[in-house]
A protein has these predicted regions:
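General helical structural elements
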Residues: 6-7, 62
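Bacterial N-terminal signal peptides
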Residues: 7-15
Length: 135
């Protein structure tokens, strides 16, 4: 009986080892300091990033990237707000809705998330389909 138990334990360990050899790749993407950049930077702006940025480009990149890399985590490091009239008019709602559509997994807060006060920040967090984390 003891031999059968040891044999079963060894077989279990062998099967566990065999299954552990299958590796997966996890990709972590993050955005940071997007500052309400819903539209691309004006093509004619005196800016090295003129014509770049914007939610449509980001969403397209993420869709294409996830097609080729199914195991992706997407985070934002804060400061999604402040910087354009979108934030001044809608107080972060546009930004959070876009992040929901792009499938963010989590975000943390930056200093500009406090710009319209704690009540507004709490409202945005309730709208988010992802956790807002901070240490």
């Amino acid at each position: 009986m003891k031999r059968i138990s040891i044999y079963c334990l060894l077989m279990f360990c062998a099967l566990l080892t065999a299954s552990a050899q299958q590796t997966k790749q996890l990709v972590i993407l993050h955005t940071s300091d997007t500052h309400s950049r819903i539209e691309p930077i004006d093509l004619h702006a005196a800016d090295p990033y003129a014509g770049a940025g914007g939610v449509v480009r980001r969403a397209t990149f993420l869709k294409d990237f996830r097609t080729k890399n199914p195991d992706v985590l997407l985070f934002d490091c804060g400061d999604i707000s402040q910087g354009t009239p979108y934030y001044n008019l809608f107080r972060g709602e546009v930004e959070v809705r876009m992040m929901n559509l792009m499938g963010y997994d989590a975000m943390t807060i930056g200093n500009h998330e406090f710009d319209f006060g704690l009540d507004n920040m709490a409202r945005l967090f309730r709208m988010a389909h992802f956790p807002v984390v901070c240490a």
